[in-house]
């Protein structure tokens, strides 16, 4: 795998002779190559909104509770599991609180983070909600996030992509 991606991280997508890595780049590539199934709104303001929501999750929440960071906490700093869960809970909760406020204030929100069709933001959100559940985050303060998650999970693409359904899914 390191021959494909020297970082040793997912996602990596191989499309013919092209090797794609990093979620933002892969999503942008999909948007350009498969325009009939857009994940971004048509208007510039809508695209900005979706990218901003995506960045809130992908840049401000996820990096603090990704597998590599958690393994470092456990293995190098000898942080016990209860403290790891506390760490994740804190950072996910803080990020979700800000995201929930954005979703409440956004008049364009429909069934998804933006509008009535899936966007980049939903692609970022749903795996993070899985992490939140795994790390015992109380989701009650985030009803919009919970509603979006529930709706997305009715779609086959989201169900198939669930992190806990993957062959390398962590046990804890």
Which residues fall in each region the model found?
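GST-like domain detector, emphasizing the conserved glutathione-binding G-site
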Residues: 1-83
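Carbohydrate-binding/catalytic loop surfaces
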Residues: 119, 166-172
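Short coil/turn segments at secondary-structure boundaries
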Residues: 66-67, 162-165
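Phosphate-coordinating loops and pocket residues in cytosolic domains that bind phosphorylated ligands
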Residues: 3, 154, 163
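GST-like fold's C-terminal all-alpha helical module
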Residues: 57-154
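Active-site-flanking alpha-helical
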Residues: 31, 128-129, 162
């Amino acid at each position: 795998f390191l021959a494909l991606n020297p970082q040793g991280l997912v996602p990596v997508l191989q499309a013919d002779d092209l090797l794609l890595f990093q979620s933002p780049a892969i999503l942008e590539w999909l948007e350009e190559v498969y325009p009939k199934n857009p994940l971004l709104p048509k208007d510039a303001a809508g695209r900005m909104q979706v990218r901003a929501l995506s960045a809130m999750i992908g840049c401000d929440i996820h990096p603090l509770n990704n597998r590599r960071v958690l393994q470092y906490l456990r293995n190098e700093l000898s942080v016990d599991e209860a403290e790891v869960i506390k760490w994740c809970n804190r950072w996910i909760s803080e990020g979700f609180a800000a995201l929930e406020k954005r979703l409440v204030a956004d008049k364009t929100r429909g069934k998804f983070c933006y509008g009535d069709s899936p966007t980049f933001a939903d692609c970022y959100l749903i795996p993070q909600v899985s992490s939140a559940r795994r790390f015992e985050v109380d989701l009650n303060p985030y009803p919009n996030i919970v509603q979006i998650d529930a709706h997305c999970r009715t779609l086959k693409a989201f169900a198939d992509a669930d992190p806990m359904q993957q062959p390398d899914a962590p046990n804890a």
